[in-house]
Amino acid sequence: MKTPIELKILDSRIGSEFPLPAYATPGSAGMDLRAMLDTNLTIAPGETVLIPTGIAVHVADPSLAAVILPRSGMGHKHGIVLGNLVGLIDSDYQGPLMVSCWNRGNEPYTLQIGDRLAQLVFVPVVQAEFKLVDEFDTSMRGEGGFGHSGTR
């Protein structure tokens, strides 16, 4: 299923020097976002920086949202993870997409202009409405919390 999403190019290098975000394979869930920097940027250990992607999206459909997620190799190989763990893009947001990068590693890491640094995934949204109750119906789990089911 394909859903049209409005895309605004904020950096003229997108679509010329660097491709528009796209799915790499028919089974891809995310589209890569690129570091649209003016110069290469070295992120020191422990440092967090905000990186422009050069695009904005308007999802428009309230039954959808977008999330910015890490690329697996960045965190595993280089210690570069998202500073906010997941970026949530509400359907009515129209501003620039930025990626918060945190170097949790022990070595400086240099992002180069146009590097793929995160991925954009569109997800369904259910807006819940709370129903106030005094007690919950009994469930098998009940109030069992962290670690209650063990590890084996």
UniProtKB/Swiss-Prot annotation:
Database matches in Pfam families: dUTPase
Binding of substrate, residues: R71, S72, G73, N84, L88, I89, D90, M98
Known cofactor(s): Mg(2+)
CDD domains (UniProt xref): trimeric_dUTPase
InterPro entries named among the record's database cross-references: dUTPase (IPR008181), dUTPase-like (IPR029054), dUTPase-like_sf (IPR036157), dUTPase_trimeric (IPR033704)
Keywords: Hydrolase, Magnesium, Metal-binding, Nucleotide metabolism
EC number(s) from the headed UniProt entry: 3.6.1.23
Record field: catalytic activity: dUTP + H2O = dUMP + diphosphate + H(+)
The protein's annotated pathway: Pyrimidine metabolism; dUMP biosynthesis; dUMP from dCTP (dUTP route): step 2/2
GO biological process: dUMP biosynthetic process; dUTP catabolic process
One Gene Ontology molecular-function label: magnesium ion binding
Family: Belongs to the dUTPase family.
Reported function: This enzyme is involved in nucleotide metabolism: it produces dUMP, the immediate precursor of thymidine nucleotides and it decreases the intracellular concentration of dUTP so that uracil cannot be incorporated into DNA.
PANTHER family noted in UniProt: DEOXYURIDINE 5'-TRIPHOSPHATE NUCLEOTIDOHYDROLASE
Entry protein name: Deoxyuridine 5'-triphosphate nucleotidohydrolase
Organism: Shewanella amazonensis (strain ATCC BAA-1098 / SB2B)
Organism placement in taxonomy: Bacteria, Pseudomonadati, Pseudomonadota, Gammaproteobacteria, Alteromonadales
Underlying gene: dut
